[in-house]
């Protein structure tokens, strides 16, 4: 180290106000790359490329960084522990400190690596739709200036259809879509009423039509159904055209549900038009009815417009490990209690056996409703050991179901605040657009 106060045996690192004294020899082979680079500095300019400031008289180097994070990193490189996130510090901020000092994500403990991956994935999802530099990069390419207006128009259309709170037009479009979803659900539910079915059958009998037809009949419900299907079809086509990644669009669960819900209507119409009769429809009637009932999943489309459903979906996505753990708990307990209950109620004394517990699969139903404290009362133990086992089953169900609830609750609160923050940002942009 040729730069610095001559004769000084040590140097001082001042990181965010915390001072650390290191010998020159230790500085040469220090594990942190940024610190070890100080040993090769030959001028003040070289030093200021490594640190933020330098005091030649005291031989002190200043780093305007997070002192607590550096303390954790310093303990790790000195071999006094494993590298974990500092308490009360954002994972991304701590990772930024690691990159600054020359460490990588692989140096973190596995649990912290998972936390970092989850946070980076959530942050990417949160900000990817609001990336401001995409259009600028397109304009910088050859021919990008001419194509930029069309790209801006497509991006504006995409946000209008995909982000209901991004603009005033998006909110109006979302409101219309919600109305169509509600009307479609009401018609679908009403069509299963006996009086509704009888009236529809009487109308169809005038044209010698079958009892089931998915086509647009002359009754008002058929007209309403055709209008709703037309709206959803147009919406799906426009969203596909303006989407950035067509393959990713097709793979989305909501879009798959849209396709499965729309297709049966057009299949039935085409079969009626080309065959002129409904014999083919009768053969495929069960399949079409099942697919037609897929329209009930259109209610999930409301998740695009209501923050509560979005919070629920995001919570389930982030807590899939806890959900799997809960499922494993229930399956293990169900296997144990169902086998014991079948043995106590039916397997020991065949003469006075309980006919409801004839097999372990039959006992599984009783275990599930007991662990969840529902208790329909359709089957219950009659022997003393069986009733004792039932009490243990109920208590264990309460305990097992309560274990992962804390993690899921905290994740739900975090997801709710994140989505509220995003909604507030869009509301501010919407207010600006309305005022302008």
Swiss-Prot record:
Transmembrane segments: 169-190, 221-242, 254-274, 285-305, 321-342, 388-416
Membrane topology: Multi-pass membrane protein
Intramembrane segments: 361-372, 373-380
Tissue occurrence: Expressed in the brain, liver, testis, small intestine, colon, thymus and adrenal gland.
GO molecular function, one term: potassium channel regulator activity
Ranges facing Cytoplasmic side: 1-168, 243-253, 306-320, 417-436
Pfam family, one: BTB_2
GO biological process: action potential; potassium ion transmembrane transport; protein homooligomerization; regulation of potassium ion transmembrane transport; regulation of potassium ion transport
Chain ranges for the short sequence motif Selectivity filter as given in the UniProt record: 373-378
Residue ranges that the UniProt entry lists as topological domain Extracellular: 191-220, 275-284, 343-360, 381-387
UniProt subcellular location: Cell membrane; Cytoplasm
Signal peptide: none
Highest taxon above the source species: Eukaryota
Gene Ontology, cellular component aspect: endoplasmic reticulum; membrane; plasma membrane; voltage-gated potassium channel complex
Keywords per UniProt: Cell membrane, Cytoplasm, Ion channel, Ion transport, Membrane, Potassium, Potassium channel, Potassium transport, Transmembrane, Transmembrane helix, Transport, Voltage-gated channel
Subcellular location, principal: membrane
PANTHER family from the UniProt entry: POTASSIUM VOLTAGE-GATED CHANNEL SUBFAMILY G MEMBER 3, VOLTAGE-GATED POTASSIUM CHANNEL
Family from the record: Belongs to the potassium channel family. G (TC 1.A.1.2) subfamily. Kv6.3/KCNG3 sub-subfamily.
Function, as annotated: Regulatory subunit of the voltage-gated potassium (Kv) channel which, when coassembled with KCNB1, modulates the kinetics parameters of the heterotetrameric channel namely the inactivation and deactivation rate. Potassium channel subunit that does not form functional channels by itself. Reduces the deactivation rate. Moderately accelerates activation.
UniProt remark on domains: The transmembrane segment S4 functions as a voltage-sensor and is characterized by a series of positively charged amino acids at every third position. Channel opening and closing is effected by a conformation change that affects the position and orientation of the voltage-sensor paddle formed by S3 and S4 within the membrane. A transmembrane electric field that is positive inside would push the positively charged S4 segment outwards, thereby opening the pore, while a field that is negative inside would pull the S4 segment inwards and close the pore.
Quaternary structure note: Heterotetramer with KCNB1. Does not form homomultimers.
Protein name: Voltage-gated potassium channel regulatory subunit KCNG3
Species this protein is from: Homo sapiens
Lineage: Eukaryota, Metazoa, Chordata, Craniata, Vertebrata
Gene: KCNG3
């Amino acid at each position: 180290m040729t730069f610095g106060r001559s004769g000084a045996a040590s140097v001082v690192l001042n990181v965010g106000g915390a001072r650390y004294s290191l010998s020159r020899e230790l500085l040469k082979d220090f594990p942190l790359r940024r610190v070890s680079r100080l040993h090769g500095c030959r001028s003040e300019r070289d030093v200021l490329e490594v640190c933020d400031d330098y005091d030649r008289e005291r031989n002190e180097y200043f780093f305007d960084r997070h002192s607590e994070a550096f303390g954790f990193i310093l303990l790790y490189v000195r071999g006094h522990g494993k590298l974990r996130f500092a308490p009360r510090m954002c994972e991304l901020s701590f990772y930024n400190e690691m990159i600054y000092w020359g460490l990588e994500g692989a140096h973190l403990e596995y649990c912290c690596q998972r936390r970092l991956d989850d946070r980076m994935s959530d942050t990417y999802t949160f900000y990817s739709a609001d990336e401001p530099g995409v259009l600028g990069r397109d304009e910088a390419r050859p021919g990008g200036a001419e194509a930029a207006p069309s790209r801006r128009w497509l991006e504006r259309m995409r946000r209008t259809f995909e982000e209901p709170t991004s603009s005033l037009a998006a909110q109006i479009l979302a409101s219309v879509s919600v109305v169509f979803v509600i009307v479609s659900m009401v018609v679908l539910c009403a069509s299963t009423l006996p009086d509704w079915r009888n009236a529809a059958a009487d109308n169809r009998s005038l044209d010698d039509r079958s009892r089931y037809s998915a086509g647009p009949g002359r009754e008002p419900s058929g007209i309403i159904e055709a209008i709703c299907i037309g709206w959803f079809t147009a919406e799906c086509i426009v969203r596909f055209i303006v989407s950035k990644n067509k393959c990713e669009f097709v793979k989305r669960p909501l879009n798959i549900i849209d396709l499965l819900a729309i297709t049966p209507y057009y299949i039935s119409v085409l079969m009626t038009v080309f065959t002129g009769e409904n014999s083919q429809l009768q053969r495929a009637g069960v399949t079409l009815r099942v697919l037609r009932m897929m329209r009930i999943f259109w209610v999930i489309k409301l998740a695009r417009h209501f923050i509560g459903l979005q919070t629920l979906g995001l919570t389930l996505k982030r807590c899939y490990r806890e959900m799997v753990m809960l499922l494993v708990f229930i399956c293990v307990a169900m296997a144990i209690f169902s086998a014991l209950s079948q043995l106590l109620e039916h397997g020991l004394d065949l003469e006075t056996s309980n006919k409801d517990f004839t097999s372990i699969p039959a006992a599984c139903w009783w275990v599930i409703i007991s662990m969840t404290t529902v208790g329909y009362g359709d089957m219950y133990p009659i022997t003393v050991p069986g009733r004792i086992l039932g009490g243990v089953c109920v208590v264990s169900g309460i305990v097992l179901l309560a274990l992962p609830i804390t993690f899921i609750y905290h994740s739900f609160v975090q997801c709710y605040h994140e989505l509220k923050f995003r909604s507030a940002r869009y509301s501010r942009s919407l207010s600006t657009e309305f005022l302008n």
